[in-house]
Amino acid sequence: MQVEALTRRLKTSIIELIDKGYKYFGAGGALGFDTLAAQTVLALKNDYPHIKLILVLPCITQANSWSVDDKAIYEGVKAAADKVVYTSHEYTRGCMHKRNRHLVDNSSACICYLTEKTGGTAYTVDYAQSKNLLVINVAKK
């Protein structure tokens, strides 16, 4: 799927949640969909200034091995976020899992881009469904 089409689906889904009364949006800060989702929430703050972006990050050192360009985007999103939460101080084997569970445990809806039946995203979406969260998969819209 093209980034432009995905961004449109994501924006539409976020606006639908805003229209239902949602105002806090969490993102995990990973490269790819997490970053796109965070950037979309930040862009929507122009029209919906009451919404808040909460970055839930796995560890302080998450971006250490990223490219200069990816780090710059990450730092920009982090600086613009309304709140930043770290679920672990240092990188550990389970810190991504801990971050994902924190996002689900503190949410009532989950917007995802899920195309595989296995992996971290699939596990997190399964966990969200087990917690009865509203799950919106923009890969299927």
PLM region descriptions:
Residues 1-141:
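Acidic/glycine-enriched connector segments
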